[in-house]
Structure formats: C-alpha cells, structure tokens
Amino acid sequence: MARHRAPKSAANDNRGTAGRESDATECQHAEHGPLELSNLDFPAQFVVWALRAWVQAFKSGASFDAVTQHGFTRFGLQASALALDGAMTVLAASASRPIDIRCVHCRTLSPDEAILLDAVASAQDERHFMATVALRKTMPGTAARIALPHMADLARDLARAGMRLNSMAVRSMYMAAETDATPQARRWLH
C-alpha cells in the first residue's frame, strides 16, 4: 500500500500548514509598500532570492543547487553559493528568535531579509563591524562572528562579479523595515 503525501509548499516561516495550495497566489498579491522587492536593484534582488532559495532547500531537504536551478553557476558564483550556505547554516543553527525569510514568490521584503541585505552591503563596503552589528540582530554575538567571514566572502564574490549592492538603497529599506517591525511604543526613548 503506497503512502500519499501532500506536496510541500515553498518555504516561508510566516505560514502554517493550512492553505498551502494558495501560498504563491497570496504572496504574489501582497500589499504594496516601501518594502517591495521591486524597489531593489538586481544584485539585492538576487541576494534575497538566494536567501529564500536556501531556506526552501533547507526545509524541503533538497539540494540548494537543485532548488536554485544552478542560478549561481550561471553567473559564475559557485563560491558565493558556498559562502551563502555557510552563513545561513550558522543562522539556522543559532538564530536567537524566529527569522522571517519569505517564500520565493513573495513580492515584499521582510525585516529580517533587509537585515541580511544590510550585512552583505556593509561587508561589500568593507564595514565589517556594521555587518556584524546587523548579523547580531538575528543571532548571538559569537554566531555573528562565525557567520561574518562567510558573509564577507559572499559580498566579495558578488562584487567581483559586478553585483554590487547599492548600500544607500539597502540601508533605507533596512531602516523602513526596522521602523515597521518596531512597535510604536518602543520607537521613542522616554
């Protein structure tokens, strides 16, 4: 007797198991706002896609290369895929809270995706302390120090391939995400 299992949906830390058939449709029709993925340039969109693909592969147990359909290979970024895998493995093992990485179809950027983009952009600008500060918002300090070399390798490899993140645009998205994620009562010091 064969066991039948429902197909797994795309990875998304924000969703339960109910309504899996409509996940992609719901994500594609998310409300537009300042954290819209289309507001980012291609290198930043590529990094967000890679983060989301890594989470999808991690949750489904599939090969990261298979999930990305050899996307890194197409751009000659095999070393970047390894660096991303290293950083995300550290994050998955040590996250200090639930991390919001959306499904690959989602049109909006989560605050945590903005934090990771800020870390990559800071590393590309050789601002490693700021990259560590960003990483510490998702993981303990020791884990951030372990993840930093992987993030720096990813940033360097992307820059060598001509994929420099616009650090000002990423920073403004990060600030908007941080404002959206912070409850009104905690935004002001009294």
Map each language-model feature to its residues:
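Polar/charged low-complexity regulatory segments
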Residues: 1-117, 121-190
